[in-house]
Amino acid sequence: TTWSRGLGDVYKRQNDKSLPRMMSIQNPYSLLNRSYEVGLAEVSIREEIGCLSYSPLASGYLSGKYRNGKFPKGSRMERDFDFWTRYRKPNTEKAVEEYYKISKKYDLDMSQMSIKFCEEQEFMTSVIIGATTMEQLKTNIESVKVKLSEEVIKEINNVQKIYPNPCP
């Protein structure tokens, strides 16, 4: 891809000129946006340039609070609806519903499952979490204790095959 070639070019120029090397790249990455895997992940792994992912919960969609098109009063989607067009795509709700079913099937918190999936990627250096409330922060931090089984990963990857990157 263009981004992976560009990243590779930057890395090569840094080496050619003995400049300090790039250590990380900050990109969005979530169950709804795995586009980093197309080209950039390979360069990240090969050149040891870690990804610092932001929006692992897709602005709250992967917490489950916006399921079925409902936007709780005072939520960012209710408050700033016109700003968040990235997530209003044809397959967003379908993918979210499938991820929700996986989390329930395996007795996982949907937010924690989503964050942990990001964290476990080989190219990932760190996952930048955010929270509006202390309860959300505690839930997100607790994701470090979550273990995703091979079955969970397989089911997550199957959703990606059916609804690839609904919110790039």
Question: What does each of the following model-derived ranges do?
Answer:
Residues 20, 43-102, 164:
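Glycine-rich, positively charged active-site loop/lid region within alpha/beta enzyme cores that binds
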Residues 35-38, 62-69, 140:
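Short, well-ordered secondary-structure micro-motifs
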